[in-house]
């Protein structure tokens, strides 16, 4: 550590150190959703202090997940030492310094303390427009627009487009673009997109087959037992409601034989699309399906009224 203090951090490494009050020994996690680095690292706090160092070849937006399940972001840059200081009970408000972008992000976070949610969202929009070329703006987008709390899907899409236009080669922006664009394009209030696919029985289906009908598009994957539970709950709920919906299952499984057995075991005979491409399936991309299991609810006018519903009891069938 003496050598580090004397020479500083190497050009291909980053150092993240901090001091938190009102905590002795604990740990939290650091990771990159967008692929800035692989895996999840554990940062250990001892006597209220921590030091974390890793190899880094480019600036990375990293997520910090704390023991109380709150989350914040830090921008890691090669050759830099980044410092965090604050109170453990309000760790999301801790000051992060050491680079211009982290200080910009800290100033924004500090300015939002005590503001109403509406004013915070307005400030986030203004921040992204003003600082669209920064990684700090990407962090603000993730905190405010890549969240179920944001109901204005059109504004979320506009913010994503603003970032993409300003940073077309930024790996994090491109990841968010590919992930969220289909979701925003098919958000609540939007029309069911045009599609064409073949069921496991060899029948061609398109959006026209469901015109004038209520539809549930259900994403399943039987590598997780949650899909069995979700479908059982769904079937029970539909039976109780007099089954007023058409159901289209989109399976992300790669083994059709195993899929067929699973569906037979729970007595489900809805039409199934399974092209064995999992999350790379063109149809999955068209619908913006990202959670397994989950459901999208479409009314008889072809309008999406719910999406990404991951719990059966949260489904609204009274439309």
Residues of each region from the PLM?
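Sec-dependent bacterial lipoprotein signal peptides
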Residues: 1-5
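Structural microenvironment flanking redox-active thiols in thiol-disulfide oxidoreductases
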Residues: 228-266, 278-285
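N-terminal "domain-start" segment that seeds a small globular fold
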Residues: 174-207, 318-319
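A non-transmembrane, solvent-exposed segment enriched in polar/low-complexity residues
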Residues: 7-130
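Short, small/polar residue-rich loop motifs at catalytic or cofactor-binding pockets
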Residues: 37-38, 191, 290-292
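N-terminal targeting signals for export/organelle localization
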Residues: 7-8, 117-188
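Short active-site neighborhood of thiol/selenol oxidoreductases, capturing the structured segment around
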Residues: 205-234, 246-247
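Thiol/disulfide oxidoreductase modules built on the thioredoxin-like
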Residues: 266-268, 275-319
């Amino acid at each position: 550590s003496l050598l580090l203090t004397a020479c500083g951090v190497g050009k291909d490494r980053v150092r993240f150190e901090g001091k938190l009050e009102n905590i002795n020994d604990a740990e939290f996690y650091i990771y990159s959703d967008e692929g800035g680095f692989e895996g999840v690292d554990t940062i250990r706090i001892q006597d209220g202090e921590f030091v974390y160092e890793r190899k880094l070849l480019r600036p990375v937006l990293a997520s910090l997940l704390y023991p109380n399940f709150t989350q914040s972001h830090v921008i890691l840059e090669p050759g830099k030492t980044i410092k965090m200081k604050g109170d453990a009970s309000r760790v999301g408000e801790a000051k992060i310094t050491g680079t211009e972008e982290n200080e910009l992000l800290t100033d924004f976070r500090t300015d939002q303390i005590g503001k109403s949610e509406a004013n915070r969202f307005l400030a986030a929009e203004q921040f992204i427009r003003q600082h669209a070329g920064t990684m700090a703006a990407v962090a603000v987008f993730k905190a405010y627009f890549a969240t179920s709390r944001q109901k204005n899907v059109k504004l979320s899409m506009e913010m994503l487009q603003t970032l993409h236009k300003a940073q077309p080669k930024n790996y994090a922006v491109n990841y968010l673009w590919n992930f969220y664009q289909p979701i925003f394009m098919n958000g609540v209030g939007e029309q069911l997109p045009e599609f064409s696919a073949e069921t496991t029985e060899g029948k061609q289906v398109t959006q026209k087959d469901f015109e004038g009908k209520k539809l549930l598009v259900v994403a399943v994957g039987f590598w997780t037992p949650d899909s069995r539970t979700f479908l059982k709950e769904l079937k029970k709920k539909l039976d109780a409601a007099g089954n007023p919906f058409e159901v289209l299952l989109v399976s992300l499984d790669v083994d059709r034989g195993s899929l067929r057995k699973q569906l037979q075991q729970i007595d489900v005979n809805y039409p199934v699309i399974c092209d064995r491409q999992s999350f790379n399936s063109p149809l999955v991309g068209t619908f913006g399906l990202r959670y397994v299991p989950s459901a999208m609810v479409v009314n008889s006018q072809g309008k999406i009224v719910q999406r990404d519903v991951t719990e059966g009891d949260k489904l609204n069938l009274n439309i």
